[in-house]
Amino acid sequence: MSKDEISYQILYRYSLEKLYSTLTRRVDNVLSFALVFLGVGVTINVGSPFILGPGIVGIAILKRVLRFGTRSAQADRQSRAWLKLFNTQHRFPSDKTLFLAFTSLEQDASEAWSMLIGPAIVMTESALGKTPIEPLTAGEKLCAFLSGATKSQPADRN
């Protein structure tokens, strides 16, 4: 891989991890709010406890099994590592050492949802000043909106 290809991949991985981190954090926050909302409903005796109770249990199980908060934190750490590599890539003496750093970071990558791949590509190409070629599907547009992909990302090399 050339240095430009590695640079593109690093920025793409940063974008993907950042989108995944943001989306999973927002999902975790929505589920937490739903837990509090349903819990208040049970406490002040609004609605049927036989409906609110299983709702609380279901959301708690969902949060525990899918671990959105943990996934968000791990993806955030990984996105910071990708951004650091992108901003310090000029310090690597050769393409080979940069590629080795790239592959070592790649081993810890999150298993991001496939609906975020398209928005990550668009973010990467936009950050590099290119015009995205393929349009996003409706689902990808929704995921991009929910994960904050509509905001511009930094692409400077300090």
Question: What is the predicted function of each stretch?
Answer:
Residues 1-29, 44, 69-158:
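Cytosol-facing regions at membranes
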